[in-house]
Protein backbone atom coordinates (compact mmCIF):
# COMPACT_ATOMS: atom_id res chain seq x y z
CA UNK A 1 0.00 0.00 0.00
CA UNK A 2 1.40 3.36 -1.04
CA UNK A 3 1.71 6.45 1.11
CA UNK A 4 -0.69 9.24 0.22
CA UNK A 5 0.61 12.54 -1.10
CA UNK A 6 0.09 15.79 0.80
CA UNK A 7 -2.55 16.81 -1.75
CA UNK A 8 -4.42 13.51 -1.33
CA UNK A 9 -4.36 13.83 2.46
CA UNK A 10 -5.52 17.45 2.41
CA UNK A 11 -8.35 16.61 0.01
CA UNK A 12 -9.46 13.71 2.21
CA UNK A 13 -9.34 15.82 5.37
CA UNK A 14 -11.78 18.26 3.78
CA UNK A 15 -14.36 15.47 4.01
CA UNK A 16 -13.40 14.33 7.50
CA UNK A 17 -14.51 17.06 9.93
CA UNK A 18 -12.70 16.95 13.25
CA UNK A 19 -9.66 15.12 11.88
CA UNK A 20 -6.29 16.85 11.61
CA UNK A 21 -2.92 15.86 10.30
CA UNK A 22 -0.04 15.67 12.72
CA UNK A 23 3.10 14.73 10.85
CA UNK A 24 2.68 11.20 9.53
CA UNK A 25 -0.65 10.54 11.25
CA UNK A 26 -4.29 11.59 11.41
CA UNK A 27 -5.76 12.62 14.77
CA UNK A 28 -9.20 13.21 16.21
CA UNK A 29 -10.27 13.84 19.80
CA UNK A 30 -13.90 13.17 20.70
CA UNK A 31 -15.60 14.14 23.95
CA UNK A 32 -18.48 11.88 24.91
CA UNK A 33 -21.39 12.63 27.24
CA UNK A 34 -20.19 10.04 29.74
CA UNK A 35 -17.05 7.99 30.39
CA UNK A 36 -18.78 4.70 29.55
CA UNK A 37 -20.04 6.10 26.24
CA UNK A 38 -16.42 6.60 25.21
CA UNK A 39 -15.46 3.13 26.39
CA UNK A 40 -18.35 1.64 24.43
CA UNK A 41 -17.22 3.47 21.27
CA UNK A 42 -13.65 2.26 21.77
CA UNK A 43 -14.88 -1.34 22.04
CA UNK A 44 -16.85 -1.08 18.78
CA UNK A 45 -13.93 0.55 16.96
CA UNK A 46 -11.47 -2.01 18.36
CA UNK A 47 -13.63 -4.86 17.04
CA UNK A 48 -13.66 -3.31 13.57
CA UNK A 49 -9.92 -2.56 13.69
CA UNK A 50 -9.21 -6.16 14.60
CA UNK A 51 -11.35 -7.42 11.71
CA UNK A 52 -9.41 -5.32 9.17
CA UNK A 53 -6.03 -5.77 10.90
CA UNK A 54 -5.45 -2.02 11.13
CA UNK A 55 -5.23 -0.69 14.67
CA UNK A 56 -5.44 2.92 15.83
CA UNK A 57 -3.57 4.37 18.76
CA UNK A 58 -6.24 5.21 21.32
CA UNK A 59 -5.87 7.48 24.34
CA UNK A 60 -8.68 7.64 26.90
CA UNK A 61 -8.87 10.60 29.29
CA UNK A 62 -12.13 10.54 31.24
CA UNK A 63 -14.79 11.44 28.62
CA UNK A 64 -12.32 12.35 25.85
CA UNK A 65 -11.01 9.67 23.51
CA UNK A 66 -8.25 10.51 21.04
CA UNK A 67 -7.67 8.38 17.96
CA UNK A 68 -4.36 8.53 16.07
CA UNK A 69 -4.09 6.74 12.73
CA UNK A 70 -0.98 5.84 10.77
CA UNK A 71 0.10 2.85 8.73
CA UNK A 72 3.26 2.04 10.64
CA UNK A 73 4.44 -0.58 8.15
CA UNK A 74 4.44 2.10 5.42
CA UNK A 75 5.73 4.94 7.57
CA UNK A 76 2.82 7.31 7.13
CA UNK A 77 -0.75 7.85 6.00
CA UNK A 78 -2.40 5.46 3.54
CA UNK A 79 -5.89 4.70 2.28
CA UNK A 80 -6.24 2.31 5.24
CA UNK A 81 -6.07 5.28 7.60
CA UNK A 82 -8.69 7.24 5.67
CA UNK A 83 -11.01 4.23 5.65
CA UNK A 84 -10.56 3.74 9.39
CA UNK A 85 -11.21 7.45 10.04
CA UNK A 86 -14.49 7.15 8.15
CA UNK A 87 -15.42 4.04 10.14
CA UNK A 88 -14.61 5.77 13.42
CA UNK A 89 -16.84 8.69 12.43
CA UNK A 90 -19.66 6.27 11.62
CA UNK A 91 -19.19 4.34 14.86
CA UNK A 92 -19.31 7.47 17.01
CA UNK A 93 -22.20 8.93 15.04
CA UNK A 94 -20.43 12.15 14.09
From Swiss-Prot:
Catalyzed reactions per annotation: (4aS,6R)-4a-hydroxy-L-erythro-5,6,7,8-tetrahydrobiopterin = (6R)-L-erythro-6,7-dihydrobiopterin + H2O
EC number: 4.2.1.96
One Pfam family, short name: Pterin_4a
Keywords in alphabetical order: Lyase
Gene Ontology molecular functions: 4-alpha-hydroxytetrahydrobiopterin dehydratase activity
Enzyme class: lyase
Domain of life: Bacteria
Keyword Transcription regulation: no
Any single biological process term in GO: tetrahydrobiopterin biosynthetic process
InterPro entries (alphabetical): PCD_sf, Pterin_deHydtase
Family: Belongs to the pterin-4-alpha-carbinolamine dehydratase family.
Protein's recorded name: Putative pterin-4-alpha-carbinolamine dehydratase
Species this protein is from: Mycobacteroides abscessus (strain ATCC 19977 / DSM 44196 / CCUG 20993 / CIP 104536 / JCM 13569 / NCTC 13031 / TMC 1543 / L948)
Amino acid sequence: MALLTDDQINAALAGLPGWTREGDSLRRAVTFDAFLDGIDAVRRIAEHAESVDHHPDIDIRWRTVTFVLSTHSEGGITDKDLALAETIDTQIGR
